[in-house]
Structure formats: C-alpha cells, structure tokens
Amino acid sequence: MATKFDIVSQALLLIGESPISSFSEGVSGTVAANLYDTTRDSFLTATRWRFAVGKLKLSRLTDTPLNEYSYAFQLPSDLLMPIGTYPSARYEIYEDKLYSNHNEVELDYIFRPDESTFPAYFVEALAAQLAEKFAIPITNNQTMRQAMEAHAADTYRKAAFRDAQGRTPKAIKHRPYIAVRG
C-alpha cells in the first residue's frame, strides 16, 4: 500500500537523497512536486498495465453532435488513454467526449488508479523512472542519471513481464506452416 510520498522517497533514496514526507521539503520536494504527476501518468500509459485497465459502458449524452457522428458519450474523468471500443468502430474524441455512430459504446481504457493499489513491481519501476528524472535537477550528476536510466529500463522490463503474467496468452490464429502440411 504505497503512497506518492513512499514512491518519491524510494526514488530519492536511489539517487542518494533523503526521503521526504511532503512536497514542500527543500529542492527534492520541489522537484518531486513538479515531476511526479506527469511521470506517473506517462508511465501508466507506457504499456497496458493490467491493474490500470478498465472497461466501462459510456453514458450517452442528449446533445446532438456538431460533427459527422450521430451520438456523443461522456468519457470517464479518470481516463488517461483509450484502448478501444466495443462494438469496434470508428470514433473520435474531442475534449471529454467520445463521438460514434453507435448508440451504445463500451470503452476499454487506461485509467489513473490510486497509488495504494499499485502492485509492488510497478512501485519499484515507477520509483526507478522517477530517480532517472530526479538525477540531474537534484544531484546535477550525469553519471548518476545514466545509471538510473539503465536501472529504470531494467525495472520497467521486469515489471512489464510480471504484469503480463496476469492474463491468458493470446492464441496464434494464423498458422501458415500447419495449413501447408494439409
């Protein structure tokens, strides 16, 4: 059950700094306050983390769309990135609305979960990513940044692998070599 300060403190420890308990604590707190939210959101959308993927039947709005689509739907407030819709059809997003010609739409999307629900492997990978971002503004040490870049890439790869274990592998549908054997 991590908090944003736990994650930031892990990142600071990776670059040899002291942990913080608020974003008003010196240079480290200021840097963390400015980089945490965007880094977290970018990292959440870097892959389809299973704990951050949701499915939702969208609420149709009564307003008539002003474009070529027949229907408008309200997007969820925690949306970070759409993945796709069901039925699978052409759609467009403008501001906080999705437009489609279907009268009902289910959206698969990446959302922003609370930090307390992050799995340990994601916390570790996000902390490494933050450490890379913090290295120059806090330590002004290019060697440290390069080391954290390598560490962040390694922990990301491991975290993505662990997260992928939570779903059934996709079956290979097209098998040209088997079809040739007849």
Show the residue positions of the predicted features.
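Glycine-enriched, solvent-exposed interface loops adjoining structured elements
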Residues: 1-182
